[in-house]
UniProtKB/Swiss-Prot annotation:
Keywords: 4Fe-4S, Chloroplast, Electron transport, Iron, Iron-sulfur, Membrane, Metal-binding, Oxidoreductase, Photosynthesis, Photosystem I, Plastid, Repeat, Thylakoid, Transport. [4Fe-4S] cluster 1 binds at residues 11, 14, 17, 58. The eukaryotic PSI reaction center is composed of at least 11 subunits. This is Photosystem I iron-sulfur center. It comes from Zygnema circumcarinatum (Green alga). GO terms for cellular component: chloroplast thylakoid membrane; photosystem I. Residues 2-31, 39-68 form the 4Fe-4S ferredoxin-type domain. One of its GO terms (molecular function) is metal ion binding. Its EC number is 1.97.1.12.
Length: 81
């Protein structure tokens, strides 16, 4: 089942989320906005199983990577009533 995976600009390019993902949903891409010159990207969200290991691995105070499961997606994006 595919889940929505969002990468935020608080990403520090550490690769922890990429290494934690058991289904290779995430990858690093070049980005000049951080010291590491790379940022996480989620090109294969259809393979996301919703384990949230990427969230657990993220060392930033505000999670740079978030996985939204089903109804959680619309609620967090302000689309649910």
């Amino acid at each position: 089942m595919a889940h929505s995976v969002k990468i935020y600009d608080t990403c520090i390019g550490c690769t922890q989320c990429v290494r934690a993902c058991p289904t290779d949903v995430l990858e690093m891409i070049p980005w000049d906005g951080c010291k590491a010159s790379q940022i996480a990207s989620a090109p294969r969200t259809e393979d996301c199983v919703g384990c949230k290991r990427c969230e657990s691995a993220c060392p930033t105070d505000f999670l740079s990577v978030r996985v939204y499961l089903g109804p959680e997606t619309t609620r967090s994006m302000g689309l649910a009533y």
